[in-house]
Regions:
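Domain-level signal for soluble alpha/beta catalytic cores
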Residues: 1-258
Length: 258
């Protein structure tokens, strides 16, 4: 699968570790294999990019299945889980880290503090990205909006901040417009291929590659987004169309309000 996306023109592939924290793996009785599973995922991705200059491996860290703001898990337990997974990913050789599908600002802050502490302890410098998920209601699951997220995350030395999952690109426009004028760093956008539907008992995404690419090009050309990709429902065909759509497009200049 990594190879198919790289062949389509992707410059970065994510490790298959979105749900590879001990918190999630314990639900399947394999939490004791956390380090092993993360290391294997990094090895798979690194094998895929071998011999492909200018291609990188991003270590994916999902939100787990517990939200601290809702009392699902203690801060100490969440911190320990992130530290274990981060250590495995970094020691296995990822080029950057992505905290994605973030739904709880408390969770993000705990993860980031743990991330930068772990990198310091390991003596490593790895770029850190954050991607939040906002529902069609306009907020994260715990009720925070894009403004609250931006203010909360601005003090951290992030490589980028942006959105992924939950919706297609059309439902992200207002949030990205806000970041265009309020977020001082790089912006990323990785939408789903529209909203999922159930067809014959299977989840299906209706947004076709050409339309996906057209909408994503606008984010780069008009909103100054510099990192683009796809989340649920994204196929190599979507990435191929996206690469062609933005190949010669430079991110629009942005003026951030003071």
């Amino acid at each position: 699968l990594h190879q198919e996306f790289l062949d389509a023109g992707a410059q970065v592939v994510e490790t298959n570790t979105f749900g590879a924290s001990r918190i999630v793996l314990d639900e399947y009785g394999i939490g004791n294999r956390t380090a092993e599973i993360n290391a294997a995922a990094v090895a798979n991705a690194r094998k895929a990019i071998a011999g492909r200059p200018g291609r990188y491996v991003c270590g994916s860290l999902g939100p787990t299945t517990k939200l601290p703001s809702l009392g699902h898990i203690s801060p100490d337990a969440l911190t320990a889980a992130y530290r274990e997974q981060l250590t495995a990913l970094v020691e296995s050789g990822v080029d950057l880290l992505l905290l994605e599908t973030c739904q709880d600002l408390f969770q993000i802050k705990l993860a980031l503090i743990t991330c930068f502490e772990t990198l310091e302890q390991l003596g490593r410098e790895v770029p850190v990205m954050v991607s939040a998920t906002l529902e069609r209601t306009g907020t994260m699951l715990v009720g925070s909006d894009i403004a609250a997220a931006a203010v909360t995350l601005e003090p951290f030395p992030l490589f980028s901040f942006g959105l992924n999952c939950a919706t297609g690109p059309a439902d992200m426009v207002s949030h990205i417009h806000y970041l265009q004028h309020q977020w001082p760093g790089r912006i990323s956008v990785m939408p789903n291929q529209g909203l999922p539907e159930i067809v014959n008992g299977q989840t299906a995404y209706r947004l076709q590659p050409a339309e996906f690419a057209r909408q994503m090009r606008v984010f780069v050309a008009d909103y100054g987004v510099s990192i683009v990709g796809g989340c649920c429902g994204t196929t190599p065909a979507h990435i191929r169309a996206l690469v062609e759509a933005v190949r010669d497009v430079h991110p629009a200049a942005r003026t951030v309000d003071s």
